[in-house]
């Protein structure tokens, strides 16, 4: 790397003189050095910061600039000129960029020497900072090759000093070719021919090129070179910095001037416009401002089609004038054509004054100040529905919202559907001035408050809930809808006719009287069929298991005498009225579904006399039972009527049913057997076995007529219908008639009647052999079992639970009644039997067998007439007691109304303290009787002592 010959701090002018001196020192024919120096020094040369500094272009800015600005200016100049670059020549070798272009100097003193001076034309040939060549002012472009040929005009023969010139680093031909290529590459588009290029290359060989010694230095050394004035500020004096104005030819078309695409025609209106003229609305303004000075020439040179674009724009989109109906409110002025000025900005269309602007502004009504609203509290909102202010007294009562849907709306619908009917605004009536609220008297205020609907609740709830008349309207609407008749177009539901059942026949009121007593018309009623046996056969075919017991076959059907003359209605009901409660609870288990007993359930209280076909044969009684007895309510709520039993002959022992062995049965089977007799389920197995043994003995061990049976004496007296007047009842006749009965205690294996058949054999899985059972089967009810049952009962009941004894006469013994039985079948002895009572005592007329809380069984004797009288007195005493004034201590009647549990001992003590004497009953009452009374009235009652023998604390 060679060191530079001159230091960067040396002035460039001195360096030039030294250079020339050294170059011509070896040539004797050269002019003097002073002449050369003086000529060379007179040339104004710009300051250079380095050997490779380019000349400053004339269009360079005099201020500081950035790379972005230089790039923008280069792009702008390239866009203005249409450039066609020639194909570049192939270079043999990539050479480094020449720092200083060679300068051609003619040193001949005799011939005119064209010394190149820094003129603007030469500077154009050089490459500017932006890499773009400059144009000449003459209005055309010249090639760099022509400039080179014009400058080098001195022949080589007239310049002998060039032969003695020191050789340059590069040859002359290479230098000229390289310099020409560099100039051609950096100049603007050149349109020179090949002849010019060859001419330039030929003349370049005769040139004496002068070039400085090439200095190879790094980029860091260039930055350290000092310069007196920055090249950005060095501007030649003869170069004008004023911008050249843009000259637009007059005959250029508009598309070439602006390079714009034709604009899409804009639609003025999407609806049919009014028939107006735009002459006056948009007049041509002579004072319209021009956007730029260049647009005036363009507008004058624009074709007529472009100028009249707005005249025909509306015709393309608007409807024809013939189709548009002229509106009465259209302005009468005719509008002129639109302005003929085409500008970039949108033309502001002037709109003429409308007719509305000519109408004088009406005086706006003066708004009256709204009266101050009093702040309303929640209580005020809640009580606003009850205030009478602002309401018209003579106005019709407002109908409920719900009742309006039930009214016929035919007239209203016809009125609204009429085509001529129009909605009319309701006439506003002036509100009457509210009168001052009249102060009512105390009595009137009380009456008004009594008629007022009170709604209870908090004030916030009352403010949000429905109006107080909502519930009242709801109930009124429900009542009105219920009163409506059925739909006449709906098909009626044909229900099967049902006769009167025991539920309706035995219905009683609050006082115990029969309700809806049916009166039979004996005159117009249809006659009975000629063949009475047909009814019995039909019943036997429907339910053969009920009419004919198992094991009894080849029996002849008896004759049923249905004599209408023996029907009596009034007397049986009169007798029932005498013993209301007794008859109500007499045969609650008579309608059981057991097959070994058949209950009499006639739909009407008629007398049905059973006439046996043969007196010597043992026939079971045929019962006219209701076919639909399965669909009836429980037997405890029904009143049955029982027929008098016919005389029964003795049945041979061969037809006896063996006694079942309850010991081998399971608990489930024992529970079913207990429920079949009408008892509730018993927890202990031994108690169930003992109870079943007693029931079996009471059913199968007793013999005799029905008149001698003490258990059904009351039933036969109250429920057996009488015959015609003057005749005694069949039950009484059967009781008085002498009957044959064996003397002494009857045998266990004997059967009192042929109809005494049980379903035990059908339910037990164990098969029993036919014939007489063994003797050990009759003593299954051991005394230990009876003691267990007696120990679990109250003292009054335990004395009555004993082994049945021999009784000489038991005509006054009451029947056994099972209350609140859950089983389907109850203990329903047939009137044809005369069994002994299950729990009876010969010393007492009526025995209470009601078991309390200590046992799970509920046994009670049918209330007799004496008990019915006692119950009536208890009811009267409880209801007639004065009301209590202490809320903490209500009366007994108030407790019952509030469904409070009644302590039986306390109520019995209260009744015995003089309340029964007050109502006319001379005697005392036991807690067990009070319990029976509570159960008959469905009153919640309990014992003071619990199951474990402890006293209840919270009562």
UniProtKB/Swiss-Prot annotation:
GO function term, MF aspect, one: DNA binding
Record carries keyword Nucleus: yes
Any one GO BP annotation for this protein: DNA replication
Keyword Nucleotide-binding belongs to the record: no
Extent of Basic residues compositional bias: 123-137, 209-225, 738-748, 767-776
SMART domains: AT_hook (SM00384)
Biased composition (Polar residues): 150-159, 352-362, 579-601
Low complexity composition bias: residue spans: 189-198, 705-720, 727-737, 828-841
GO CC terms in record: Slx1-Slx4 complex
Biased composition (Basic and acidic residues): 539-551
Modified how: Phosphorylated in response to DNA damage.
Keywords, ordered alphabetically: DNA damage, DNA recombination, DNA repair, Nucleus, Phosphoprotein
Oligomer and partners: Forms a heterodimer with SLX1.
Protein name: Structure-specific endonuclease subunit SLX4
